[in-house]
């Protein structure tokens, strides 16, 4: 599968909206897609493309502005990634962020050196020149730093806009050429004045207009789906989550009965979910859903399997086998619709720049069910109208299409379902234990009116047994882990500081109502270093 996020601009989604386009040249930063998200929050379309994109290609795209991302390299590494130096002569406003600022300085004749002391985390930023880029930013504010190199000498024509105690040159500008740089990360939530700075660049310097709206996206996505699909039939694997449900509503509005949704019940969903899903789509919204009970097939694939990556692969491969068999029975179909999102692509094919070779290298985190299991000879053509959206944007689109709030606000749920929330081998007994524990978690979170405050809240079953005492009897049973996190987009997350009495109620109910469990623990790990899911 081609990941256009990190290569050339995606002209299939947002083509008309790209008249107000900000492009981000990605130098391997973990925050590149977050920059895009922040710009979209200002209602301007933004995409991440390769740092190797030439000035000529950029000129053809005609973006309103260019942002150079941060990155893990030093500009003086032998094979440090370099942008085309001709971009400085395009006359397009450019903002360099961290490594991007250092690269700007180096290529334009300034000096970058290893800092005496690196700067990481929150730092007080002092504004020296509150001109266009820093308009409406407090004279003293907090920004997020992450750099070991620093600019020590400016290129001709540049001036200093801001400093910190450890970094004398923390923001720079050449207003006549509309070239700007910041040593900090304005896109990170910890940067107090970051959003104001980004808005200044987008609106005051790049002169953009707010055209990236939910209504505009829906209108254009429907138009593009109709143009691509024509009178052909489309098959969609419906999971009941916000992504596939939003996609189903969008496609149904675009092509009506040309869409067939297939719900494959692998046996790894939460308690009562298959029944609720079918009732909602078939009876309430009259969208055709073909139900396939494949529980035994999937469970048979996992007998004796304990490795999480092997679980994902087997589930993904079996899903495709079932999907292809059923599609032949129901077909023919020309297109397969997928609800691939930005975070899916980011986590499945994260990239860094190898300082020794200068080449991109994949940093494998884990396979995502919806992007990692497709065979090379897939006979469907793909339709992925949501692939450039972040989760919060998908929710906005779903809401605008009339999707019920119970689905719009549904917590993210992995494609392999409870199979990757059971560590070790998946068995019918363990599935039943986890379903019952998970139901209690959801009931109590809703009763406490905290469901919408959390990004995810779920239970994990561990493959070990612990000693306990219940009544006068010694027990030897499973522990359950509670995993509650807060997040904006799933790219980073923090463990949720929920009330102790809520945790106590959940723990008491689980150990008393779920046979086979005698211990409940709470996970207080953030992402990074951990991931949200345990597998």
Curated annotation (Swiss-Prot):
Active site, per annotation: 98, 185, 187
Binding site for ATP: 239-245
Glutamine amidotransferase type-1 domain: residues covered: 21-211
Pathway given in the UniProt record: Purine metabolism; GMP biosynthesis; GMP from XMP (L-Gln route): step 1/1
Assigned GO CC terms: cytosol
InterPro entries in the record: Class_I_gatase-like, GATASE, GMP_synth_C, GMP_synth_GATase, GMP_synthase, GMPS_ATP_PPase_dom, NAD/GMP_synthase, Rossmann-like_a/b/a_fold
GMPS ATP-PPase domain span: 212-410
EC number in record: 6.3.5.2
Catalysed reactions, as listed in the record: XMP + L-glutamine + ATP + H2O = GMP + L-glutamate + AMP + diphosphate + 2 H(+)
First-tier enzyme category under EC: ligase
GO molecular function: ATP binding; GMP synthase activity
Entries under PROSITE patterns matching the protein: GATASE_TYPE_1, GMPS_ATP_PPASE
Keywords carried by this UniProt record: ATP-binding, Glutamine amidotransferase, GMP biosynthesis, Ligase, Nucleotide-binding, Purine biosynthesis
Highest taxon listed in the record's lineage: Bacteria
Function of the protein: Catalyzes the synthesis of GMP from XMP.
Subunit and interaction comment: Homodimer.
HAMAP family according to UniProt: GMP_synthase
Stated name of the protein: GMP synthase [glutamine-hydrolyzing]
Species for this entry: Thermosynechococcus vestitus (strain NIES-2133 / IAM M-273 / BP-1)
């Amino acid at each position: 599968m081609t990941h256009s996020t990190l290569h050339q601009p995606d002209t299939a989604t947002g083509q008309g909206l790209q008249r107000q386009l900000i492009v981000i040249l990605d130098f391997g930063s973990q925050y590149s897609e977050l920059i895009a998200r922040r710009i979209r929050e200002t209602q301007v379309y933004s995409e991440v493309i390769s740092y190797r994109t030439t000035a000529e290609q950029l000129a053809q795209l005609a973006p309103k502005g260019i942002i150079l991302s941060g990155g893990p390299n030093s500009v003086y590494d032998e094979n440090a990634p370099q942008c085309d130096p001709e971009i400085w002569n395009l006359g397009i406003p450019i903002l360099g962020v961290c490594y991007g600022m250092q690269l700007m300085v180096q290529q334009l004749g300034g000096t970058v050196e290893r800092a005496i002391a690196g700067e990481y985390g929150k730092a007080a930023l002092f504004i020296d020149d509150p001109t266009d880029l820093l308009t409406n930013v407090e004279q003293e504010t907090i920004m997020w730093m992450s750099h070991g190199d620093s600019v020590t000498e400016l290129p001709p024509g540049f001036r200093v806009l801001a400093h910190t105690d450890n970094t004398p040159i923390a923001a720079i500008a050449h207003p006549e050429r509309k070239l700007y740089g910041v040593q900090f990360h304005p896109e990170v939530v910890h940067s107090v004045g970051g959003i104001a700075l980004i808005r200044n660049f987008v609106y005051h310097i790049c002169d953009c207009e707010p055209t990236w709206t939910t209504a505009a996206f829906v209108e254009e996505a429907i138009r593009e789906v109709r143009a691509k699909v024509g009178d052909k039939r489309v098959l969609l694997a419906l999971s009941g989550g916000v992504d596939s449900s939003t996609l189903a509503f969008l496609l149904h509005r675009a092509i009506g009965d040309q869409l067939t949704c297939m719900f494959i019940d692998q046996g790894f969903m939460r308690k009562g979910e298959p029944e609720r899903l079918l009732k909602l789509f078939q009876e309430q919204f009259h969208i055709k859903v073909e139900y396939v009970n494949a529980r035994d097939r999937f469970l048979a694939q996992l007998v004796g399997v304990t490795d999480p990556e092997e679980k994902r692969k087997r589930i993904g491969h079996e899903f495709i086998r079932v999907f292809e068999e059923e599609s032949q029975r129901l077909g023919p179909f020309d297109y397969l619709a997928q609800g691939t999102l930005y975070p899916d692509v980011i986590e499945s094919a994260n990239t860094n720049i190898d300082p020794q070779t200068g080449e991109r290298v994949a940093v494998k985190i884990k396979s995502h069910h919806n992007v990692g299991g497709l065979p090379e000879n897939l006979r469907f053509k793909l339709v992925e109208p949501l692939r450039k959206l972040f989760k919060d944007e998908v929710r906005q689109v779903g809401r605008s299409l009339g999707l019920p709030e119970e689905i719009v606000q549904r917590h993210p749920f992995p494609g392999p379902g409870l199979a990757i929330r059971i560590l070790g081998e998946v068995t019918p007994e363990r599935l039943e234990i986890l379903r019952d524990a998970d139901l209690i978690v959801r009931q109590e979170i809703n009763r406490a009116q905290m469901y919408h405050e959390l990004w995810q809240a779920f239970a994990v079953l561990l493959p070990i047994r612990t000693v306990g005492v219940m009544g006068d009897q010694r027990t030897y049973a499973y522990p359950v882990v509670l995993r509650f996190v807060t997040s904006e987009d799933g790219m980073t997350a923090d463990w949720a500081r929920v009330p102790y009495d809520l945790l106590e109620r959940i723990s008491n109910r689980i150990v008393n109502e779920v046979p086979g469990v005698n211990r409940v623990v709470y996970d207080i790990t953030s992402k990074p270093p951990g991931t949200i899911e345990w597998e």
